[in-house]
A protein has these predicted regions:
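Internal low-complexity, small-residue/proline-rich segments
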Residues: 1-203
Length: 203
C-alpha cells in the first residue's frame, strides 16, 4: 500500500486524501491503478458517490490486496489497512488528512518517521476484542492516562457505557467497507503518537 501511495503521488503531484476522493471514495480506491487493479478503478463511476447504485458492481468485490490473511474477520469488503489522517488529539494533522493537499517533499521531518497507512484488526457486529474496537481522541482528553493497553480499553468501555459502540454496530464498524473514505472504516488517527509512552494520551 505504501508503494502505491508513492506511485499516486508521483503521478498526481500530491498524496491521496482521506475521504477527499470523488464521491467520498477511499484512499484504497485512488491507489487501485498502482496495485495492478487499473480495470477495477476504471469501472468505478467517479462522478457520483461511491455508494451510488451505479458503483455497486465495482465496489462489491473482494480485494485480497487489502486483506491480512491471518485475520479471520478480514475479507469481503473489510480492509485490514487504513490511511492515517491525524495524530494525538486532532484528526487532520496526518499526511492523508482531508483538509489539505501534501507532497512528499512537504514532509520535512523525514518519511522514515511518518506513517501514511497502517495495518489494523477489522471489527465486526458484536465484536468486543479491545484490539478491534474504535477509539476516538475525545475518549482520552480527561482523567488519568491509562497505564496499559488493557487499561486503555477499560477506560474506553467506562466512557461509552458499553465496550462495543461502533464495534457492535451492525452497519458501521472498523474496516467496514474498503471503498468508503471515512474515519474508523478506511482511515484512522494515532491517539498515541510516535515515541510517546504507551500510557500517555497527551500530545
Amino acid at each position: 500500500m505504501g508503494s502505491a501511495i508513492h506511485g499516486d503521488e508521483a503521478a498526481f503531484g500530491s498524496l491521496p486524501q482521506g475521504g477527499g476522493g470523488p464521491g467520498g471514495s477511499s484512499i484504497q480506491v485512488r491507489i487501485l491503478p498502482y496495485l495492478e487493479l487499473g480495470p477495477l478503478y476504471n469501472s468505478i463511476n467517479h462522478g457520483v458517490s461511491i455508494l451510488d447504485k451505479s458503483n455497486v458492481t465495482s465496489t462489491d468485490v473482494t480485494n485480497s490486496v487489502f486483506h491480512c490473511p491471518p485475520d479471520p474477520l478480514a475479507g469481503s469488503h473489510n480492509p485490514s489497512y487504513a490511511g492515517c489522517v491525524g495524530s494525538g488529539d486532532y484528526r487532520n494533522l496526518g499526511v492523508l488528512g482531508g483538509e489539505k493537499t501534501l507532497r512528499l517533499a512537504d514532509i520535512r521531518d523525514g518519511l522514515a518517521a511518518t506513517v501514511a497507512a497502517s495495518e489494523y484488526l477489522v471489527g465486526g457486529a458484536g465484536v468486543v476484542d479491545r484490539l478491534r474496537l474504535v477509539y476516538t481522541p475525545d475518549d482520552f482528553t480527561t482523567g488519568p492516562a491509562p497505564a496499559s493497553a488493557d487499561a486503555f480499553a477499560a477506560r474506553r468501555g467506562d466512557l461509552v457505557g458499553e465496550v462495543p459502540e461502533l464495534g457492535g454496530d451492525t452497519q458501521y464498524y472498523k474496516g467496514f467497507y474498503w471503498a468508503l473514505g471515512v474515519e474508523n472504516i478506511t482511515l484512522y488517527n494515532h491517539i498515541i503518537t510516535h515515541n510517546k509512552p504507551k500510557g500517555d494520551r497527551h500530545t
